[in-house]
């Protein structure tokens, strides 16, 4: 159930995508404790020491978030980390910027809360509200989750049904705002005009300075792929710099050299070395173009366009409000 609520609460974050709060300024917000967008709505004051349950720890314009509300969000995030990685995870520091996992979790929760508050404020401007049945559904889910929380946790973490219901309602409203924006978006991709292939990729980034070095490295990897008894996937797992290995790539991809090479591959065929603006690729085809793959590729394109569109829309919303975050909150963990 703890992971169930988190899945509900991160829905908006997934819609907004990898940009966090909708702009690079959000990361700066977390580090500098304050964003000033030069907007008309200045951020309210927040408490920077001796936090109590009713202390304001986040301000998005005049809208504030209490320490109690923040702790409710954080409770579910913390439990998800621990259910997967164990309680010792909080002791470790990441290599990047020497942040602890606890600090990363705090920043993740802060971004999520700021997103929801920004979208909620824009919903008020646009007069978008939850219908009665939508509010009842959010409250029912909040009650279901609340009843599943151990009494000890409710007491020690100060979790209240009223606060949890508010969180669920605001997240549902944020999802509704996303759906409203997507309803305005016109995307026209006819599946039968698309060509795509499912491939395994090896990718290494390159720039003007290291281009030749990376090219030579990838040439050696290509030789390894063609001569090794190991599968392409096994080699890719150890050599790629991409986040994943398997991708669906088609003729609408902005990486035109890669797209052209991929859609021309036969099943189980490996490409030559492919140069793109961002680096070098080697592709291995595991499924050639078909009606089902065209539809999958279309859905992928639509999802990408939706995310891109909402990121831009959210950026215009977030620019309307100053944001402040409690220094005491950021200093925790």
Language-model-detected regions and their locations in the chain:
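Short, low-structural-confidence N-terminal segments
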Residues: 1-103, 312-333
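Acidic helix-start/capping segments at beta-turn-to-alpha-helix junctions
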Residues: 91-101, 114, 120, 129-150, ...
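Surface-exposed patches in mature extracellular/periplasmic domains of secreted proteins
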Residues: 127-134, 231-236, 271-273
């Amino acid at each position: 159930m703890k992971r169930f609520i988190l899945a509900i609460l991160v829905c908006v974050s997934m819609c907004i995508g990898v940009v966090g709060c909708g702009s690079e300024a959000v990361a700066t917000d977390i580090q500098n404790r304050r964003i000033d967008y030069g907007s008309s709505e200045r951020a309210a004051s927040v408490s920077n020491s001796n936090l109590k349950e009713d202390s304001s720890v986040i301000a998005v314009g005049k809208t504030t978030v209490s320490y109690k509300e923040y702790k409710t969000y954080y409770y579910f995030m913390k439990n998800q980390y621990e259910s997967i990685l164990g309680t010792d995870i909080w002791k470790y520091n990441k290599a990047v910027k020497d942040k602890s996992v606890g600090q990363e979790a705090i920043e993740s929760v802060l971004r999520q809360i700021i997103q929801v508050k920004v979208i909620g404020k824009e919903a008020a401007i646009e007069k978008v509200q939850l219908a009665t049945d939508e509010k009842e559904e959010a409250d029912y889910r909040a009650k279901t989750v609340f009843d599943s929380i151990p009494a000890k946790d409710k007491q020690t973490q100060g979790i209240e049904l009223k606060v949890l219901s508010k969180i669920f309602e605001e997240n549902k409203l944020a999802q509704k705002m996303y759906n409203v924006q997507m309803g305005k978006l016109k995307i026209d991709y006819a599946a039968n005009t698309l060509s795509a292939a499912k491939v395994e990729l090896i990718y290494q980034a390159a720039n003007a300075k290291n281009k030749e070095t990376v090219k030579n490295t990838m040439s050696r990897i290509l030789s390894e792929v063609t001569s090794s008894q190991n599968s392409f996937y096994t080699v890719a797992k150890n050599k790629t710099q991409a986040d994943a290995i398997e991708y669906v790539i088609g003729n609408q991809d902005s990486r035109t050299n890669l797209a052209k090479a991929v859609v021309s591959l036969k099943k189980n065929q490996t490409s030559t070395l492919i140069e793109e603006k961002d680096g070098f690729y080697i592709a291995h085809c595991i499924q050639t173009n078909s009606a089902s793959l065209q539809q999958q590729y279309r859905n992928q394109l639509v999802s990408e366009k939706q995310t891109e569109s909402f990121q831009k829309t959210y950026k215009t919303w977030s620019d309307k409000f100053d944001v402040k975050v409690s220094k005491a909150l950021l200093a925790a963990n």
